[in-house]
């Protein structure tokens, strides 16, 4: 089943990418993309930014106003300051709640699309051979092992294929990581070698020699 082979491999690649990048990082990226779209939520964020700007403006004016010399103006700014602060806190709490629900929704979809399929597919297709081994090339115990748990003898089970894909993806990731570290190390060493060393001038060197002779 070529389509199932590719699906299992794709799922393992996706799981490894998520583990490498981080679920929180992916959620934050999707949240920013969603906020960039022309939705009601993006309008709420625009309102929050405007409230924040108004609040900071009133706060600066309040700090620059004396409560003794200009009490009436100070009291008016103080009321505006408290009102804007209350609105800003309510808006922030509402958006934080929306962000929490968004994270739960995305986490659920991601789990179903990755970990959920990792458990469901091997169970559902446990008896389906992924592909057949060449007849007589492998001993009995090897054929039994790769067909475990319920695939026909002489075939590769979905569990064995999934395990092989996981090992291959991890191996490729480690190789890429090692290559990146090696290249970065080579660049740093080349930069260090390219730094010019200040040469000692002839007069200074001769002065040092004369000083040594006098000693």
Swiss-Prot record:
Keywords: Coiled coil, Endoplasmic reticulum, Membrane, Transmembrane, Transmembrane helix, Transport. It is a multi-pass membrane protein. Residues 1-4, 132-155 are lumenal. It is found in: Endoplasmic reticulum membrane. It holds the Pfam family CHD5. GO terms for biological process: endoplasmic reticulum unfolded protein response; intracellular calcium ion homeostasis; mitochondrion organization; protein glycosylation; retrograde vesicle-mediated transport, Golgi to endoplasmic reticulum; tail-anchored membrane protein insertion into ER membrane. Residues 25-110, 173-215 are cytoplasmic. InterPro entries: Get1, Get1_fungi, Helix_hairpin_bin_sf. GO terms for cellular component: endoplasmic reticulum; endoplasmic reticulum membrane; GET complex. Residues 72-104 form a coiled coil. The chain crosses the membrane at residues 5-24, 111-131, 156-172. Belongs to the WRB/GET1 family. Required for the post-translational delivery of tail-anchored (TA) proteins to the endoplasmic reticulum. Acts as a membrane receptor for soluble GET3, which recognizes and selectively binds the transmembrane domain of TA proteins in the cytosol. This is Protein GET1. The lineage of its organism: Eukaryota, Fungi, Dikarya, Ascomycota, Pezizomycotina.
